[in-house]
Amino acid sequence: MKVFFILIIFSFTLATCQGECYGSVPLPIDGEDVPLRTCVDTHDGQKHLIVSTWKTANSFSCECTQIGLQCCQKYVAVA
């Protein structure tokens, strides 16, 4: 019975945690891959060089790589 209640509490905790990530990749033009030189931060519009990382004002940690931009929350919020 004790294990049952622990599993219920653990399941509730997992269900209320939220994590958010998003990213973007360069789109091909006329079927040709376009080499990525910079990434544009969607939060403030600033350009960032490839292989750079930065933190946004709204708690996202972003990284620009040759395959695109990826941003994730720096923490997990409880709903």
Swiss-Prot record:
Tell where it localizes: Secreted
Q: Which domain of life is it from?
A: Eukaryota
Question: Which pairs are disulfide-linked?
Answer: C21-C72, C39-C64, C62-C71
Keyword annotations from UniProtKB, A to Z = Disulfide bond, Secreted, Signal
Cross-referenced Gene3D superfamilies: Complement Module, domain 1
InterPro entries xref list:
PSP94
Q: A Gene Ontology CC term for this entry?
A: extracellular region
Coarse class of the primary localization is: secreted
What is the annotated signal peptide range for this record? 1-19
Give the family from UniProt: Belongs to the beta-microseminoprotein family.
Function according to Swiss-Prot or TrEMBL: Shows an slight inhibitory effect toward the metalloproteinase brevilysin H6, but does not inhibit the metalloproteinases thermolysin, HR1A and HR1B.
Q: What is this protein called?
A: Small serum protein 3
